From Swiss-Prot:
Keywords, comma-separated and alphabetical: Developmental protein, Signal
Signal sequence, start to end: 1-24
GO BP field: anther wall tapetum development; anther wall tapetum formation; pollen development
Keyword Amino-acid biosynthesis listed: no
Function: Required for tapetum and pollen development.
Coiled-coil portions: none
Organism: Oryza sativa subsp. indica (Rice)
Protein name per its UniProtKB record: Anther-specific protein RTS
More about this protein: Plants expressing an RTS antisense construct display interruption of tapetal development, resulting in deformed non-viable pollen.
Amino acid sequence: MVRVAAAAAVLVLAAAAAAAAAMAAEPPTDDGAVRVAAGLTKCVSGCGSKVTSCLLGCYGGGGGAAAAATAMPFCVIGCTSDVLSCATGCSTSL
């Protein structure tokens, strides 16, 4: 269960990073140069840091084994939801 949750979280981060990479490069200008939107990259990087902290909080949550096993899926789902909202906010705020 924990490995599935961790794999799902990694997949979400990979999807967010791929979306950011796809949107980070602006189309070429008149001089043919492609300029990278540094603000978007910085925003998505911040989302990655937040989700990492969130997931570490899920795994280090304390409590008994039964309580941790019950709470873990909900914690990971919350982190996943948060990172998707964060990444979406990055693309709309620039």
